[in-house]
Amino acid sequence: MAAIIDGKAIAAAIRAEVAAGVTALTAEGGAAPGLAVVLVGEDPASLVYVGRKIAQTRQAGIRSFEHRLPAGTGEADLLGLIERLNRDDEVHGILVQLPLPRHIRADRVLDAIDPLKDVDGFHPVNVGRLSIGTDGLVPCTPLGCMLLLETVIDDFRGLKAVVIGKSNIVGKPVAMLLLERECTVTVTHILTRNLPDIVRTADIVVVAAGSPGLVRGDWVRPGAVVIDVGINRIGEPGKDSRLVGDAAFDELGHAAAITPVPGGVGPMTVACLLRNTLVAARRQQGADASPKKGA
C-alpha cells in the first residue's frame, strides 16, 4: 500500500521552523519580517485564501500589512501602491493575490514588484535565477512539492521524473527544481502523445494539469512517487461536491508514496510563502538567507 505523504504535518513543521527563524532573526537585532498582502476586489475564494495566509503569517511571528482595494481600482493606482511597498523598509515581502480584475494586467503588476520582495517567486528575475540554478525566491507550490519529495527520497540523482503540466506557476518551475537535483526530467501536458506510456517510465510523477483523475492506476509503475498538485471540485455545490486531485488516488496503492487531495500539496503553499518571507527578510537585512533553495 502506498505511503501517504502528509502535507498538513510537514507544513506545520515548516511553519514551526519559520517561527523559530523569526525569533532568531529578532534575537540577532533584526526586524521581524513584514509581508504586505494586496487584494483587489471581493472574489470569495481570494478572501478566504488571504484570510488563511494572514492568520498563519501572524502565528509565525511575521508582521502582516493588508491592503484591500475595490474591484474598480485602476492599474496605475495598483502600480503606485506596489512602488510604495517596494520602498517601505518594514515590508520584506509583497504578495498580490490573483486573479486580478480583467482590466488590470497581472504581468505588469507582478513585474513591478522588487525581485527581493517577490515572495511568490513570479518575477522574471527570480524565474531567471531559478533557470540557471542561482539563489532566488522560488515559487511556493513547486518548492512545496520538492520539500514533500525530500521526505521520501534521499537521493534524486539519475531518477526519471515526469511533470504533467506546463504552467509558469507549477509545471515549468518544478521541472527546473528537479533538474537542479540531477533528475532526468520530461515535461508533458494533457495533449502530449502517448502520455500514459511516458508516465510509466517515471520514478517521480508530478501532476498539475487541472484534470480530475487524469493519472490512472495503470499509468504509474510500482514503486513510483506521485505528487498530485491538482485541486478540482466535482459534484453539485453544497450537496455531494468534493475535492479530488489530478491522480486517481484509489487506483494508486501500488505507488511507493502519494500525496492526498486535500491535505497534500495545498498546505505546503502557504508554509512555503512564510519560508520565502523569512528568507527575503534575512537577505534584505544582510543576514544569512538560510534555508536556501531546495534545502
UniProtKB/Swiss-Prot annotation:
PROSITE patterns: THF_DHG_CYH_1, THF_DHG_CYH_2. Keywords: Amino-acid biosynthesis, Histidine biosynthesis, Hydrolase, Methionine biosynthesis, Multifunctional enzyme, NADP, One-carbon metabolism, Oxidoreductase, Purine biosynthesis. This is Bifunctional protein FolD 1. Its EC number is 1.5.1.5, 3.5.4.9. GO terms for cellular component: cytosol. GO terms for molecular function: methenyltetrahydrofolate cyclohydrolase activity; methylenetetrahydrofolate dehydrogenase (NADP+) activity. Homodimer. Catalyzes the oxidation of 5,10-methylenetetrahydrofolate to 5,10-methenyltetrahydrofolate and then the hydrolysis of 5,10-methenyltetrahydrofolate to 10-formyltetrahydrofolate. Pathway: One-carbon metabolism; tetrahydrofolate interconversion. It catalyses: (6R)-5,10-methylene-5,6,7,8-tetrahydrofolate + NADP(+) = (6R)-5,10-methenyltetrahydrofolate + NADPH; (6R)-5,10-methenyltetrahydrofolate + H2O = (6R)-10-formyltetrahydrofolate + H(+). It comes from Rhizorhabdus wittichii (strain DSM 6014 / CCUG 31198 / JCM 15750 / NBRC 105917 / EY 4224 / RW1) (Sphingomonas wittichii). Gene3D superfamilies: Leucine Dehydrogenase, chain A, domain 1, NAD(P)-binding Rossmann-like Domain. SUPFAM superfamilies: Aminoacid dehydrogenase-like, N-terminal domain, NAD(P)-binding Rossmann-fold domains. Pfam families: THF_DHG_CYH, THF_DHG_CYH_C. The lineage of its organism: Bacteria, Pseudomonadati, Pseudomonadota, Alphaproteobacteria, Sphingomonadales. Belongs to the tetrahydrofolate dehydrogenase/cyclohydrolase family. InterPro entries: Aminoacid_DH-like_N_sf, NAD(P)-bd_dom_sf, THF_DH/CycHdrlase, THF_DH/CycHdrlase_cat_dom, THF_DH/CycHdrlase_CS, THF_DH/CycHdrlase_NAD-bd_dom.
